[in-house]
Structures are given as C-alpha cells and as structure tokens.
Amino acid sequence: MALALPIIQTIGAIVDKLPAGTRRLKVLSLAHPDLLMSVDQIPRVFPHHDPEKIQPRADSADVRKRHGLPESTGDLPDTRSLFDAIGCDITIVDVVEAGDVDRIVDLNEPLDPDYREAFDLVLDPGTVEHCFNIGQTIRNAATSVAADGFVLHANPMSMFNHGFYNLNPTLFYDFYNQNGFEIHLIAAMTGPAAARKFVDVPAVKRFRNAPPEARMVSVARRVEVREIGWPTQTKYGGKSG
C-alpha cells in the first residue's frame, strides 16, 4: 500500500485542521503505507514541522522499484518517523505481518470495541478493495473516527484486477454523507508514480471515460457521531444527513 504526494499533502492539510493543543493526534492506517515522496520534499509539504526528525528508509531503493518511482527520487521517508514528527501516533493494522504492523486484524469482520471513535484520522491507503466484505471494512474505518476526526480513502477506480473491486465516487459520497460525515474531497488521482495529480470527477452523476489506472480519493470529517448504517444511493433517493 502506498500514498502518493497529493495524498500526503492532503494529510498535511488535515493535520493542520485538527486541534493540536498538548495532545498528540491518533492515526489508524489500514495496512502499512509507503510514502511516495522524497525526503527533500518534506520541508515544502510540512513547513511547520522539523524535517530533521524524519528518518530516510534504508530500503528506499526497493520501495522505489516496487512502486515505479525513478531512482532520481532519492531516499523516501520512514512512515512512522514522519507521522511522529508531525505530532501523530500511528497504529498500523493488517491481516498479515506485512512490514511494520502493530496489530493483526481481519477487516472483513467488525473491529474490537477499543477502536470505536478512537482516532483523529483513519487512513485507507488502498486496502478496502482487497477485503471481500467491503461494506464492513468501510464501516470499520468510519466507526474508528472520533468526533471531528477525518477519514481518507485512496482506492482503485479504474485498475482492473488490482483488487476485488473498483470503486465509484458515489460510494464514498453516499456512505459518509448519510452517516454524519461532511465530505471534504472527492477526486480521481492519475498519472505516473512520480507525478500523480488530482482530477475532478462528479460525486454522484454518471460520467464516462474515467482516467486509466486512476484511484478514487475521498476525505470526510465526522461532524456527528451516530450508528453507522448502510446508505441508499443518491440516484435512488438517498438523502444526506
């Protein structure tokens, strides 16, 4: 799983919106997210934080190759040290011990109660599409978000056989809009690994010619804590609220 530069920039903007105070922010990531950026880009992306606290990955060359980044990208930042430097404690879960994982969980099933409303930011770096019980997996992400916290998804929209599913904008728009969240971003992300960019797509209206190999990126904020239910598609009368 990986987070491209536009998503990392979005995370920086989210962290700036969350109350800093004296409390460190709590982040949950559904699988370990490789960060597809150079350590040299850190001061521009996180100008209010000390880049000296962020360690480069010893396996940067292998990660660059795996994700199609050019060698000129240089060293990539270590995920934990970056989140630590920006004032966040990150918890990483996965179904297997793949890389740096804190806890083994099966996201096809409901998470344990200690996850409920426990995190300021929940990250899905491209995981829910690999879970067959995808509705429950997205519900797990939503229920883990604390009041006024955020959830970010980055999943395939037109990446065939990447996972079990390609996802449409209306999925996240309807699910979060109907469950006490406020939508902050709905976009496609496309382009080569070193130059990905957001592209506008309609949230609920039918459209054609989706960008090839595109990801669906959504950000929502939990403005009202309630039981998470199953949405009705806007096309068939689903209402916000």
State where each predicted segment sits:
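Conserved SAM-binding loop
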Residues: 27, 74-161
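A short acidic (Asp/Glu
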Residues: 39-42, 102-103, 163-165
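Short, glycine/serine-rich, charged loops/turns that create anion-binding
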Residues: 34-35, 97, 158, 224
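Class I SAM-dependent methyltransferase Rossmann-like catalytic core
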Residues: 1-29, 34-47
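A structural signal for well-ordered alpha-helical segments within the folded catalytic domains
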Residues: 5, 9-12, 77-80, 139, ...
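Residue-level detector of flexible, active-site-proximal loop/helix-junction positions
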Residues: 34, 97-99, 109, 188-193
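Aromatic- and Gly/Pro-rich amphipathic surface segment
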Residues: 35-91
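S-adenosyl-L-methionine-dependent methyltransferase catalytic module, highlighting the catalytic core
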Residues: 67-73, 84-86, 132-241
